[in-house]
Design a protein with these regions (language model features):
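Recognition helices and adjacent regulatory flanks at domain boundaries
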Residues: 127, 172-173, 177-265
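Intrinsically disordered, low-complexity protein-interaction/activation regions
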Residues: 1-192, 196, 201-202, 259-265
Length: 265
């Protein structure tokens, strides 16, 4: 007889920190304070390797670790995390060996930030291959996860790095979504998505290029040229550079099609 299908454990590091398995779950209210959230998130991000105790302590407290008995304090945090995780699944635990901690999850566990990166890889691969119909789903997954806050209200260098990584995932996923919308002739949607890209990363010219294509494709060449003028001014004012040849080539084609230019802003 076939074994009954089982939902995998799901660990959400974005939004409210939560772990769930079927109808069992725990969220950050059962994690030992801000330090517990930081410990679980760091161990989850680094779960492919053992994390030295002093490295985890730095991730948990940054420069403000408890004087003297920090190892005892960290051990207490990990013990509480271990108990909460085992309440979901005996295979979920934090192992200790050779002065290191390591988060151990079932082989089929789903971690949201990992899923976002995997989905982005799939989406970009589909777009590169011209398979836009199959790119939308994974791109939407990546963009949705990456738009959620990571450890809101908590700051540290490693947290800032992960937020930057998620921001990049979100921008690239939005670009994939815009590419799909363009390929499907959904120009207003492509323009909306491209505007999100340039709002998040105003110096990323691919966002401006796709915005120009979307506006022009929707019949608004003058607005597309105004987008180019905005890009040109931004780059000149902030970076002292001119747009890339690819961006200028789009503007040149638009000017030729409209029989002139657009007022600079």
């Amino acid at each position: 007889m076939a074994k009954p299908w089982k939902n995998p454990l799901r660990l959400y590091l974005t939004g409210r920190l939560t772990a769930e398995l079927g109808d069992r779950r725990f969220d950050e209210r059962r994690v030992p304070g801000r330090q517990g959230r930081r410990a679980l998130a760091y161990l989850a991000l680094e779960r492919a390797r053992p994390v030295p105790i002093d490295e985890l302590a730095e991730a948990v407290w940054s420069t403000a670790s408890p004087s003297g008995a920090w190892e005892t304090a960290l051990s207490a945090i990990v013990s509480k995390l271990r108990a909460s995780l085992r309440g979901l699944d005996p295979l979920c635990t934090v192992t200790t060996a050779a002065g290191c901690y390591q988060l151990s999850l079932p082989h089929d566990a789903w971690v949201d930030v990992e899923a976002a990166r995997d989905a982005l890889d799939q989406a970009e691969g589909h777009v590169r291959a011209g398979h836009t119909k199959t790119a939308w789903g994974p791109a939407n997954v990546a963009a949705s996860i990456a738009a959620r806050p990571f450890l809101a209200g908590v700051d540290a260098e490693w947290i800032a790095r992960e937020r930057a990584t998620l921001r990049d995932v979100r921008v690239r996923a939005l670009e994939c979504l815009a590419a799909v919308a363009l390929a499907n002739g959904e120009h207003p949607l492509a323009a909306q998505l491209s505007r999100e890209v340039v709002e998040l990363e105003p110096f990323r010219e691919t966002g401006w290029q796709r915005l120009m294509h979307a506006l022009a494709g929707g019949g608004n060449r003058a607005e597309a040229l105004r987008a180019y003028a905005q890009c040109e001014k931004l780059l000149a004012d902030e970076l002292g550079v001119t747009p890339a040849p690819e961006t200028e080539a789009i503007a040149k084609r638009l000017r030729a099609a409209t029989g002139g230019g657009v007022r600079r802003i």
